[in-house]
Amino acid sequence: MKLKLKNVFLAYFLVSIAGLLYALVQLGQPCDCLPPLRAAAEQLRQKDLRISQLQADLRRPPPVPAQPPEPEALPTIYVITPTYARLVQKAELVRLSQTLSLVPRLHWLLVEDAESPTPLVSGLLAASGLLFTHLAVLTPKAQRLREGEPGWVRPRGVEQRNKALDWLRGKGGAVGGEKDPPPPGTQGVVYFADDDNTYSRELFKEMRWTRGVSVWPVGLVGGLRFEGPRVQDGRVVGFHTAWEPNRPFPLDMAGFAVALPLLLAKPNAQFDATAPRGHLESSLLSHLVDPKDLEPRAANCTQVLVWHTRTEKPKMKQEEQLQRQGQGSDPAIEV
């Protein structure tokens, strides 16, 4: 029994010595585990660097987008607006001026129905930030609406629109703003924008490249949801209208634009104050174009981008009552 235990102990001792010698030998061998460790460390370093860059980007304020320069080749839109003194005049003109301010390369020709410019309109134009020309001409008494007459009985704004056409043709008359007319050869388009309508800025994109006379529908006019040209195969073949459809050009004043070179080439083309009711637009267009040559815009006249809106006349009963008591609103406050 002792012999056997001695042998077991000896065997255990020899195996232990062999294992120890093997371990000592392995400690002296080169290790190939360093390259993976170096690669992992580099990946961590790159991730830390990327995180630092992202944190710096988040702290940096966003860059202000650069405004593209206004292309000089873009034709100018000359917007002719007749206006007259009334309680809602300033409100109408503020709304219109802020729409026009969204349109690049636009020149506003604002024509007062007055002998001379008024401070209200002069101040509004100066504050508008628009390129403008201020004109004034009084409507003759024989052409003015009489008390109680509806607005459609007599054509309105005739003298004022013709005054603006005269200025474009170099006949002067400006009382404020830009006083020199466009030089010969100027590419542009002329649009007649009443001060009480509602305009989408998309409308001005549609008209800008007019070659002759461009046309489109007008909403809320003529007792209809809209009036406008009927188009087939890209050409105007008729008009959707209910009142006197046989007029030469059954269009609303807001429903067309004219190329400036065409107007300048036809010096006698203007609005006729003696034209029959509803024929004012035709009195100008008949000098400029044949109906078959009209240029349909607004997706072949299927989009309404201008509306013939009207601001309700304010009721001033309380104001009149206070005025009789000597307590009316301060007249020095412009409304």
UniProtKB/Swiss-Prot annotation:
| Spans annotated as Disordered | 312-335
Q: Which cofactor does it need?
A: Mn(2+)
UniProt lists compositionally biased (Basic and acidic residues) regions at: 312-322
GO function terms (MF aspect): galactosylgalactosylxylosylprotein 3-beta-glucuronosyltransferase activity; glucuronosyltransferase activity; metal ion binding; protein phosphatase activator activity
Modification note: N-glycosylated.
Instruction: Cite the binding residues for Mn(2+).
Output: 196
Its protein name is Galactosylgalactosylxylosylprotein 3-beta-glucuronosyltransferase 3
Q: Which organism does this record belong to?
A: Cricetulus griseus
